[in-house]
A protein has these predicted regions:
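Sequence/structural signature of beta-propeller domains
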Residues: 1-195
């Protein structure tokens, strides 16, 4: 499986495709309409903040991906006070059809970051499936003031509400139970250079 973030600025849709070991395209997975950017910039993925993660469950039953940050209609990118509401997509790996979606909220920007007019980010950049409902998530943040920070979490979807029927989360975030998250490791504690 290969994923692409697309290019929201040029209205190039994200995609997920399955290829054989010799490079032949086997199938293109359906991307739900609400993820596709429109020409007004009012819905869909944000540029360079889409499907960076991709993982299969050990039994190869499900394929997971997630947006790196919120869809335009779901909320904002992270700030110093709040995280960004991402969507985790769970596909049936055999049929290639999306079968569930869950809310995942990133951590806020690192303390000390100055987001005013500067490059700052924090996003959900990778997932590793443990089973059908548990995953490892990796969040990577950057600011000129703090440099790169990376945190590893264990997440559970078991008590998270399914959100695939919700076109927008912006006004409903307080009503939706997100994936549960537990910090496993802040890589800053390892005292090694992060990039």
């Amino acid at each position: 499986f290969v994923s692409s973030e697309g290019d929201a600025d040029r209205q190039i849709n994200p995609f997920i495709k399955e290829f054989s070991l010799d490079g032949k395209l086997l199938k293109t997975l359906a991307i739900p309409e609400l993820f596709l950017p429109d020409d007004k910039g009012t819905k869909g993925i944000r540029n360079n903040l889409s499907f960076e993660s991709l993982t299969l469950t050990p039994d190869r039953k499900y394929l997971f991906t997630a947006t790196e940050n919120a869809l335009v209609q779901d909320g904002a990118v992270p700030s110093l006070e709040t995280g960004s509401p991402c969507r985790i997509l769970r596909y049936d790996a055999v049929s290639g059809n999306p079968e569930a979606s869950f809310l995942y909220i990133t951590e806020p920007l690192p303390a000390g970051a100055n987001p005013v007019g500067k490059l700052t980010s924090n996003g959900l950049v990778d997932l590793v499936a443990i089973d059908d409902n548990r995953l490892l998530s990796l969040e990577r943040a950057f600011s000129l003031e703090t440099g790169v920070t990376v945190k590893l979490f264990e997440i559970s979807l078991e008590k998270g509400d399914r959100i695939e029927a919700l076109e927008s989360l912006k006004s409903r975030l307080s009503e939706v139970s997100p994936a549960q998250k537990r910090l496993l490791l802040d890589l800053e504690t390892l005292k090694i250079p992060l990039d």
